From Swiss-Prot:
GO terms for molecular function: heme binding; metal ion binding; nitric-oxide synthase activity. Pfam families: NO_synthase. Its cofactor is heme; (6S)-5,6,7,8-tetrahydrofolate. The lineage of its organism: Bacteria, Bacillati, Bacillota, Bacilli, Bacillales. The gene is nos. Keywords: Heme, Iron, Metal-binding, Oxidoreductase. It catalyses: 3 reduced [flavodoxin] + 2 L-arginine + 4 O2 = 3 oxidized [flavodoxin] + 2 L-citrulline + 2 nitric oxide + 4 H2O + 5 H(+). Heme binds at residue 62. This is Nitric oxide synthase oxygenase. It comes from Staphylococcus aureus. Disulfide bonds: none annotated.
C-alpha cells in the first residue's frame, strides 16, 4: 500500500519536473528496497519541497491556490532539541510576516519522533468563559494547566504549546515584538475604534497533517495570508466566535437589526471594509474576497493549460459575503481529495489535543 502511494506521487512529481523515465524507475526501485528493509521511506529534499507545494495546489478548501508554486518550504526534519525547535518556529513567524509583506511558508518536521504542536494555529487569541475567542477555550485551558496566565482580554495571544519526544508538554510565550497585529478602525465610523478590535497578521495553520506519497508529517505549520471575510465575517461575526454583530452595528449607528432593514448586511460590508483598509494602512498583506475569486479563476485556467483537473469544496470556495458576484459560486466542483494534501487530524488521534483531558 505504501509503495503504491509512493509510486503515484513520484511518477506524478517527476513527470511534472520533466525527469526521464530511467531516473523515475531508479528512484522507485530505491524506494521499494527501502520500504522492504525499513517499512517506510525518506523523501529527498526536492521531493519534500515539491510535495508540499502540490499539497497546497490540491487543497480543495483553499481559494488562494494560484500562488502554490511560491510556497517557501523549510525542511526541519532534523530538528530534535528544544532550542532548535523554538528557533525554527520564531524563524517561520518572522519570515512569513516579512514586516507586513506576507510570504507563504511551511516548516516540516520529522514524520516520526518529531515535535508536537497543540495549537490550532501558531498565533491565536485565548478563549475565556466571558471573553476572547470561544474556538480556543480548550487550548486556553491547556495553557492554564501548564501555568500560563493571560490578561483576560479579548485578544490575549496564546503561547505556543509543544512537546518534544520523551519530554513533557511545555509552553513558550512569544516576544511581543514577534507578533504583528492590526488594530481595526473605519475612517467613516470612528466609534468602531472604541471596540478595541484587532487581529493578528499571519494565519499559520498548525493542526493539520501533511501527507506526501503515503508519508504523514503530523507537524507542518503553514501559512498564506488572510482573505478579508475570514476575519470580517467569520471570526468577528459568527455566533460561536466573537459574535460582534450587535456591537459593530451600534458602532456604525445602525438603529435596528431587523431583517428587513438590511442593516445586518450593511454591518458586514462596513466591517469588512474596515478590516481590509486597516490591514492596508498597517502595510499588511490581505486580499478581498472578489479579488481572491478572480485569482482562483486564473488558477483554474492555469491548471487547465497543464492538463490538470481542479478539485474543490464549493462551500469553502464561495466566499461568505456576496458570493453570487464570484464565478465559483455558479458552478460545482469535484471534491475528490488528491495526494499530496493536508488533512484534519482524526478525532481519535491525540496528536494535537489536550494530553490532560482527551
Amino acid at each position: 500500500m505504501l509503495f503504491k502511494e509512493a509510486q503515484a506521487f513520484i511518477e506524478n512529481m517527476y513527470k511534472e519536473c520533466h525527469y526521464e523515465t530511467q531516473i523515475i524507475n531508479k528512484r522507485l526501485h530505491d524506494i521499494e528496497l527501502e520500504i522492504k528493509e525499513t517499512g517506510t521511506y525518506t523523501h529527498t529534499e526536492e521531493e519534500l519541497i515539491y510535495g508540499a507545494k502540490m499539497a497546497w495546489r490540491n487543497s480543495n478548501r483553499c481559494i488562494g491556490r494560484l500562488f502554490w508554486d511560491s510556497l517557501n518550504v523549510i525542511d526541519a526534519r532534523d530538528v530534535t532539541d528544544e532550542a532548535s525547535f523554538l528557533s525554527s518556529i520564531t524563524y517561520h513567524i518572522t519570515q512569513a510576516t516579512n514586516e507586513g509583506k506576507l510570504k507563504p511558508y511551511i516548516t516540516i518536521y520529522a514524520p516520526k519522533d518529531g515535535p508536537k504542536i497543540f495549537n490550532n494555529q501558531l498565533i491565536r487569541y485565548a478563549g475565556y468563559d466571558n471573553c476572547g475567542d470561544p474556538a480556543e477555550k480548550e487550548v486556553t485551558r491547556l495553557a492554564n494547566h501548564l501555568g500560563w496566565k493571560g490578561k483576560g482580554t479579548n485578544f490575549d495571544v496564546l503561547p505556543l504549546i509543544y512537546q518534544l519526544p520523551n519530554e513533557s508538554v511545555k509552553f513558550y510565550e512569544y516576544p511581543t515584538s514577534l507578533i504583528k497585529e492590526v488594530p481595526i478602525e473605519h475612517n467613516h465610523y470612528p466609534k468602531l475604534r472604541k471596540l478595541n478590535l484587532k487581529w493578528y497578521a499571519v494565519p499559520i495553520i498548525s493542526n493539520m497533517d501533511l501527507k506526501i506519497g503515503g508519508i504523514v508529517y503530523p507537524t507542518a505549520p503553514f501559512n498564506g495570508w488572510y482573505m478579508v471575510t475570514e476575519i470580517g465575517v467569520r471570526n468577528f461575526i459568527d455566533d460561536y466566535r466573537y459574535n460582534l454583530l450587535e456591537k459593530v452595528a451600534d458602532a456604525f449607528e445602525f438603529d435596528t437589526l431587523k431583517n428587513n432593514s438590511f442593516n445586518k448586511d450593511r454591518a458586514l460590508v462596513e466591517l469588512n471594509y474596515a478590516v481590509y483598509h486597516s490591514f492596508k494602512k498597517e502595510g499588511v498583506s490581505i486580499v478581498d474576497h472578489l479579488t481572491a475569486a478572480k485569482q482562483f479563476e486564473l488558477f483554474e485556467r492555469n491548471e487547465a493549460q497543464q492538463g490538470r483537473q481542479v478539485t474543490g469544496k464549493w462551500s469553502w470556495l464561495a466566499p461568505p459575503l456576496s458570493p453570487t458576484l464570484t464565478s465559483n459560486y455558479h458552478h460545482g466542483y469535484d471534491n475528490t481529495v488528491k495526494d499530496p494534501n493536508f488533512f484534519y487530524k482524526k478525532k481519535e488521534s491525540n496528536a494535537n489535543q489536550c494530553p490532560f483531558h482527551h
